[in-house]
Amino acid sequence: MDIDPYKEFGATVELLSFLPSDFFPSVRDLLDTASALYREALESPEHCSPHHTALRQAILCWGELMTLATWVGNNLQDPASRDLVVNYVNTNMGLKIRQLLWFHISCLTFGRETVLEYLVSFGVWIRTPPAYRPPNAPILSTLPETTVVRRRDRGRSPRRRTPSPRRRRSQSPRRRRSQSRESQC
């Protein structure tokens, strides 16, 4: 089966493959970041978002993989075989986990649309011949600052008019919208 873990989030393995392997922080750094930013939501029994669920699954998979690696390390007598297994896990599986963790942490931090925009921008930048591209790659944290924000009141005239005397404002106090969830997801 060829399963793309990013498909339901609007991305693909190919889209993430434009980012070089050294772009992604270490698994330890990503786990620390996830814990620092989203520990409460990740440990909560409530469903917060598909990104939280995917992040939980990636963290659990990494834990199981480390358990297996420890077992292999303790039970393989041949140092060369042990090194092959460790290198394979770190190179192949480690990269996939680092990509997954980075993607979901970034989506929770910056928003899915911003992350997808970044991946497309970086993909275009990296495929453009060096002579024709800007010297610096796009930076994820700067994308929201350069995004165009449209005003809500596009149909209104810029000058506000005072209400006509016929219309009276309601005497009841305005109601605040209360959050439907108490946990912070």
Curated annotation (Swiss-Prot):
Gene3D superfamilies: Viral capsid, core domain supefamily, Hepatitis B virus. A motif (Bipartite nuclear localization signal) lies at residues 160-177. Residues 136-185 are annotated as: Disordered. One of its GO terms (molecular function) is RNA binding. InterPro entries: Hepatitis_core, Viral_capsid_core_dom_sf_HBV. Residues 157-179 are annotated as: 3 X 8 AA repeats of S-P-R-R-R-[PR]-S-Q. Phosphorylated by host SRPK1, SRPK2, and maybe protein kinase C or GAPDH. Phosphorylation is critical for pregenomic RNA packaging. Protein kinase C phosphorylation is stimulated by HBx protein and may play a role in transport of the viral genome to the nucleus at the late step during the viral replication cycle. Its main location: virion. GO terms for biological process: microtubule-dependent intracellular transport of viral material towards nucleus; symbiont entry into host cell; viral penetration into host nucleus. The modification Phosphoserine is found at S157, S164, S172. Residues 149-178 have a biased composition (Basic residues). It is found in: Virion; Host cytoplasm. GO terms for cellular component: host cell; host cell cytoplasm; T=4 icosahedral viral capsid. Residues 179-185 are annotated as: RNA binding. Pfam families: Hepatitis_core. It comes from the Viruses. Sequence repeats lie at residues 157-163, 164-171, 172-179. Keywords: Capsid protein, Cytoplasmic inwards viral transport, DNA-binding, Host cytoplasm, Host-virus interaction, Microtubular inwards viral transport, Phosphoprotein, Repeat, RNA-binding, T=4 icosahedral capsid protein, Viral penetration into host nucleus, Virion, Virus entry into host cell. Homodimerizes, then multimerizes. Interacts with cytosol exposed regions of viral L glycoprotein present in the reticulum-to-Golgi compartment. Interacts with human FLNB. Phosphorylated form interacts with host importin alpha; this interaction depends on the exposure of the NLS, which itself depends upon genome maturation and/or phosphorylation of the capsid protein. Interacts with host NUP153. Belongs to the orthohepadnavirus core antigen family. Self assembles to form an icosahedral capsid. Most capsids appear to be large particles with an icosahedral symmetry of T=4 and consist of 240 copies of capsid protein, though a fraction forms smaller T=3 particles consisting of 180 capsid proteins. Entering capsids are transported along microtubules to the nucleus. Phosphorylation of the capsid is thought to induce exposure of nuclear localization signal in the C-terminal portion of the capsid protein that allows binding to the nuclear pore complex via the importin (karyopherin-) alpha and beta. This is Capsid protein. It comes from Hepatitis B virus genotype A2 subtype adw (isolate Japan/Nishioka/1983). The gene is C.
